[in-house]
Each structure stands twice: as C-alpha cells, then as structure tokens.
Amino acid sequence: MNACERLSRVLERIQKACERAGRGENCAKLLGASKTVPPEVIREFYNCGLKVYGENRVQEFLKKYEALKDLDLEWHFIGRLQTNKVKYLMGKVVLIHSLDRKNLADEIQKRAFKNNIVQDVLIEVNVGGEETKGGVEPENLKELFEYTLELPNVKVLGLMTIPPYLENPEDVRPYFRKLRELRDELQREYNVALPHLSMGMSHDFEVAIEEGATIVRIGTLLFGERKY
C-alpha cells in the first residue's frame, strides 16, 4: 500500500467510528505521529492530504520543521517536554499536548509572553497511574487546571492521555471514558469550554473515538513500525 492508500484507509476507519458513535462527520482530527519518520515521507503524506503531525522530541522536530518549511503543515508537540526546551517550540507548534506540571506551565507562560502569543495546550493526565508515563494524576488535575487559569498566555483546550497498552482495545475503553469524564467535570465546575480530547493510537483509536476523542495520534498504521 502506498501513502495515499494507507491514509484513506485510516480516514475511512475514523469516519466509521464517528458514525458508530453518532458524532457526525469528521468528529476526530487525524494527527500523524511522526516520531522517527523522515521529512520526505511526511512530504509524501502531505501530498496525499495529511497536514497535521505530532512530534515527540524537540531536536528532531526542529530539523523537520526547517526541512518542511515550504509546506502548510500544522505541527503539534505530543512528547514529554523539558522546561529548557519550551523556548524552541514557541510560534512553531499550534498545540502542546503534554502539560503535566506547574513549572512547565510557568515556562510556557514566560516564553509565550516573550513571543507575544497565547500558547494552546492540553493537560496530559496519567489515567492508568503508570509510573513510567508522564501526566498529572487524576486527583491533582483540578489543582493544575486552576493554576493555568491564572496564566494569561497559556490556554488549556482539553486533555490528553496515553493509557496502558492492552491487547484488546475494548479493555482500554474505561481509561478513555475516564478522561472524558474528567474533562466534563472541569467544564461543569469551572464553566469553561474544553473542546479537545487527544486520545487513541493505532491499535485503539476507534474505541477512543467512540468515547469522545477529538484528536487521534496515529503512527504505525500510517508510517509502519517505528525505526528507532
């Protein structure tokens, strides 16, 4: 299968999941999780119509950003983010998916203010309670969210999670549901709009869409197994 065929197959599956969930057309945005994917492959997928990509490593992202500057791409940052790397993302990524602590929020505020922009972010929540993963614990989410409300150059648009990897996607459903419930609770309690839920990857994105995902992060199904 070539790039365009792989892309259209994934888009078709997204569409069907949206319909099953009764959520209407284009209910979830497809983000190409392009860690380790070379610029020429991204260019190929761009020519097939995929314009949204997410990177995990700042250094790798900056190289691709420069190499693909001639394309009208929408870049997201989806990996764990060190405070000393925040400055390199300003003005280059439309959405940071991995805000999970106050000092990172402070740094994004500082750098966004310097650049005279408002940086859109998602708060990453560790719904599975896994020690190896980033993300704020669900019980500390409100505290972090309240903290961001005081930062004029940081705008939270929703939540993100990387749930435990389980063979059967159905077993992941409770984690996706939990994230949606946490988002709904914040919206009610603080009377704010948090339109985005970034959840679901190659093996479980359909279940994520059924549970309310608005952004799915797909790597393997588009680009093949990762070459580390």
From Swiss-Prot:
Keywords annotated in UniProt: Pyridoxal phosphate
PROSITE patterns recorded: UPF0001
N6-(pyridoxal phosphate)lysine PTM sites in chain numbering: 35
GO MF, one example: pyridoxal phosphate binding
UniProt KW Endoplasmic reticulum keyword: no
A Pfam family of this chain: Ala_racemase_N
InterPro entries found in the cross-reference section: Ala_racemase_N (IPR001608), PLP-binding_barrel (IPR029066), PyrdxlP_homeostasis (IPR011078)
Leader peptide range in chain numbering: none
Recorded GO CC terms: cytoplasm
Similarity annotation: Belongs to the pyridoxal phosphate-binding protein YggS/PROSC family.
Known role: Pyridoxal 5'-phosphate (PLP)-binding protein, which is involved in PLP homeostasis.
PANTHER family assigned: PROLINE SYNTHETASE CO-TRANSCRIBED BACTERIAL HOMOLOG PROTEIN (PTHR10146), PYRIDOXAL PHOSPHATE HOMEOSTASIS PROTEIN (PTHR10146:SF14)
NCBIfam families the UniProt entry points to: YggS family pyridoxal phosphate-dependent enzyme
Name of this chain's protein: Pyridoxal phosphate homeostasis protein
Species the sequence originates in: Aquifex aeolicus (strain VF5)
Taxon lineage: Bacteria, Pseudomonadati, Aquificota, Aquificia, Aquificales
